[in-house]
Amino acid sequence: MIQMQTTLGVADNSGARQVQCIKVLGGSRRRYAGIGDIIKVSVKDAIPRGRVKKGEVYNAVVVRTRRGVRRPDGSVIRFDGNAAVLLNNQLQPIGTRVFGPVTRELRSEKFMRIISLAPEVL
């Protein structure tokens, strides 16, 4: 459950370490984003010589949340932290690798690239 001002870790090798949600996309009054939702983020911490710089604004897809996601069989998958993968304007991943597990809920037409790059799909 991600809202404005939430800080997230970055689960790819784009060069960003920490990002902050500045907008939840998808409707003017939408408050929260979950796994698989697209948010607008600002880079708060970046590594030197990375693809992205501190202060830049990107789209991102949420891949892990502490709140987790509920499956139809009643099980809940939760994670230790919130994480996102940075996207460009065409909603393609900026990084070439994805770190850590992602959930099966990302298996839509838009995010198959992230699923294929991830080391583990839960």
Swiss-Prot record:
- Gene3D superfamilies tied to this protein: Ribosomal protein L14 (2.40.150.20)
Question: Where would one find coiled-coil regions in this protein?
Answer: none
Q: Name one GO cellular component term.
A: cytosolic large ribosomal subunit
Gene Ontology molecular functions: large ribosomal subunit rRNA binding; structural constituent of ribosome
Q: Which InterPro entries match?
A: Ribosomal_uL14, Ribosomal_uL14_bac-type, Ribosomal_uL14_CS, Ribosomal_uL14_sf
Q: Which GO terms describe its biological process?
A: translation
Q: Which family does it belong to?
A: Belongs to the universal ribosomal protein uL14 family.
User: Can the keyword rRNA-binding be found in this entry's annotation?
Assistant: yes
Q: Which SMART domains match?
A: Ribosomal_L14
Keyword Ribosomal protein listed: yes
Arranged from A to Z, the UniProt key words for this protein are:
Ribonucleoprotein, Ribosomal protein, RNA-binding, rRNA-binding
Q: What does this protein do?
A: Binds to 23S rRNA. Forms part of two intersubunit bridges in the 70S ribosome.
Assembly and partners are described as:
Part of the 50S ribosomal subunit. Forms a cluster with proteins L3 and L19. In the 70S ribosome, L14 and L19 interact and together make contacts with the 16S rRNA in bridges B5 and B8.
Q: How far does the signal peptide extend, from start to end residue?
A: none
Per the UniProt entry, what species is this protein from, by scientific name? Alkalilimnicola ehrlichii (strain ATCC BAA-1101 / DSM 17681 / MLHE-1)
Its recorded name reads Large ribosomal subunit protein uL14
